[in-house]
Structures are given as C-alpha cells and as structure tokens.
C-alpha cells in the first residue's frame, strides 16, 4: 500500500522555476561563448551586476532584455519567443496570487519545458550546476556511470531522453561541467541491482564502480552519497518520474524527467515531492549495507557473465 506523504508548510519565498532555469541557461550560454559579464551587459544594455542577478534569478528580467541576450548568444528566435512566453511578467509577485487546486499552485509555480533538445540541454545544466541535489533513480544517473554502461543506456534505440550531453544536443551544453563541491545524494531503486543494463559484464562493472564510490564517501566533507532504496515498501517517490530536489544559487525547486523536463517550486505539490524524497532517504539502506548490496550484486552479474 502506498504511504501518504504530508507536505511541510512553506518556509521560504520561492522564485518561479522558469526564472531559475533561465538564469542557468543565460550563464551557460555566456560562458560557452567565452564572454564576460561586462560583454553580456553591453549586449543587453544593462549593467554587469544586473546580468549577474539575472543569472542567479535574484531579480526579474524584462522580455526585451531576454530577447537581446538570447539573440546575442545565437539562440533561434522560436526558442527565444518560447522562453519569453514561459516567464512570469517582470512585476509578478507570487504572494499577490491565490493558490489553486489540490496542488496549491500559483500561476507560475510549475513549468514543463517542452522545447525539445534545448529543454534537455537546460535540464542537464540544472543538474550539473546545482549546489545540492537529492534524487531518486531507477537507473544509474548521469555522473555516476562507467563508459560501457553510459553507452548502453544512452543508445538511441532504447533512450528517449538523454540526460548527458550527447551528439545532437546544443553545443553550449557540452561545456557544462559538474559543479565543484556539489552535495549530491542519490537514492537508487533496489531493482538497479538486478537489471543487467548493457549485459551482465557491463552491469557488473557498473555496480563495482558504485561500490567504490560508496567506499570513498567522506561523511565530514559532504559531496556524493549513494544509497539503495529497498523494495520492501511502496513510497511516494515510486509514483514519480526521476524526481529530484535541487538548489541553485539558494533557490530550491523540484524537477522531474519524462518525455520532457518539468520544474516546480512554492506549491503544495513541490513540497510534497520534497517530503517524499526525504521519506525515501529515511527508508534507504545505510552506507555499509548499501556497499554490501552493491558488491554482492556485482559478483552475481560477473558470475553470470562468465557462465
């Protein structure tokens, strides 16, 4: 039976997800172009400090400035127009709007980014540049994969939405690296231990790699934490597609990935996802048990590969 999750009350003034993701996009485009804040400011007709605030989603940006900057960075007009339509008005204040429905959403709390390859590039940039991540995965996620496993799961024959900068995605996203000092907690569904993605040999190597990462965890320094989530109970996160809570420049939002990325902040729905992820973290195996499960599963895969 699915365990119900009660969201906590709101504790912060949320920023609209589209503004947060736009900020990541603007910074990624600027840095890929090799431009300084001052150069971007000249293109936008604003100050360097204003551009910096836009990139950190600390202040609203006008539609005209969005258009000037994105066209300056070489973004196609159809994608520029799409982003301008997605943003809240420059004078939008969430507290002035009533929350609607069971999800308790204000008008711009949820954003489904349906812009195809540009949307996937933005999602990759969000995950790579976040200062903190808490995520639940039914497959080993980006950043933790061996080369052989990555090739298997990103094979176009089986992969609908690539969460790595693969050939065909916009050039700028290939320059985005994982943030230094990122605090990332990955909850892996227990089924990962038994699904031989890429074959037994490939999966055995991947599980060994995960076990080594768990062995190298530094509890004092933070950084990467990997835990196995047992199948002994059905939790709220099991109903979601690649749920994660990420923090970018102090802004917290939840993300999901199905046929396209989605983002949410501020709403009851967003708080419920966050609470569900924390419930899953509490139910996950400890470090030692996670390591034992990974080693045991790797041994099983390797034995089957040799038979």
Whereabouts are the PLM-identified features?
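Short glycine/serine/threonine/alanine-rich loop segments
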Residues: 35, 46, 224
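C-terminal regulatory/effector modules of DNA-binding transcriptional regulators
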Residues: 199-307
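Interdomain hinge/linker segments and adjacent boundary elements that couple functional modules
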Residues: 2-24, 32, 38-42, 49, ...
């Amino acid at each position: 039976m699915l365990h119900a999750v009660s969201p906590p009350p709101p504790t912060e003034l949320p920023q609209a997800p589209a503004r947060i993701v736009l900020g990541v996009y603007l910074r990624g485009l600027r840095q890929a172009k090799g431009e300084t804040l001052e150069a971007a400011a000249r293109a936008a007709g604003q100050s360097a400090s204003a551009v910096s605030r836009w990139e950190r989603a600390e202040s609203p940006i006008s539609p005209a400035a969005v258009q000037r900057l994105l066209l300056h960075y070489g973004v196609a007009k159809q994608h520029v127009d799409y982003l301008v339509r997605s943003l809240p008005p420059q004078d939008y204040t969430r507290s002035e709007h009533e929350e609607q429905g069971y999800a308790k959403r204000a008008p711009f709390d949820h954003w489904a980014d349906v812009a195809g390859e540009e949307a996937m590039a933005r999602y990759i940039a969000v995950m790579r540049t976040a200062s903190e991540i808490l995520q639940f995965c039914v497959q080993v996620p980006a950043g933790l994969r061996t080369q052989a496993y990555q090739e298997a799961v990103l094979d176009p024959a089986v992969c609908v939405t690539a969460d790595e900068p693969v050939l065909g995605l916009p050039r700028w996203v290939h320059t985005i690296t994982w943030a230094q000092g990122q605090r990332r907690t990955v909850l892996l569904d227990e089924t990962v231990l038994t699904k031989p993605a890429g074959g037994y040999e490939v999966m055995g190597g991947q599980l060994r790699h995960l076990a080594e990462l768990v062995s190298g965890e530094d509890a004092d320094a933070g950084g990467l934490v990997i835990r196995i989530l047992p199948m002994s109970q059905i939790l709220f996160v099991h109903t979601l597609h690649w749920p994660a809570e990420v923090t970018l420049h102090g802004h917290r939002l939840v993300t999901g990935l199905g046929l396209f990325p989605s983002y949410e902040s501020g709403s009851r729905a967003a708080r419920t996802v966050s609470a569900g992820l924390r419930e899953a973290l509490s139910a996950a195996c400890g470090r030692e048990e996670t390591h034992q499960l990974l080693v045991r599963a790797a041994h099983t895969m390797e034995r089957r590969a040799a038979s």
